[in-house]
């Protein structure tokens, strides 16, 4: 008779564990993951952090209304770009997300911005992580 409650508890724990392993990690969206070849792209301006100022100008015009500015980060509309979830991504992945957007998350595509300015924007996003 004592074995039944222990067995039921063990089965319940196993079921919870199995269900947890099937859930995607919080904060990730598998439908918005940069393809490997795009994620592997290197920022041609990575060795020129002074170009982040150009990215800041682009950010002020196109991104700050949702993502906030350097003093007032992330609004309720969009994630904090200085946060770990964004900063852990490769430059290529960030560039791909800027370029392609995500309509499911109300992130517009900024592929119309010239490529050099999008790479400068990636530099600026990186600088936001440095300020934490």
What are these regions (language model features)?
Residues 45, 49, 54-56, 68-99:
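Gly/Gly-Pro-rich "capping" loops immediately C-terminal to redox-active cysteine motifs
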Residues 21-27, 45, 74-82, 99-132:
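Axial heme c-ligation environment in periplasmic c-type cytochrome domains
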Residues 1-4:
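Positively charged n-region of N-terminal signal peptides that target proteins for export
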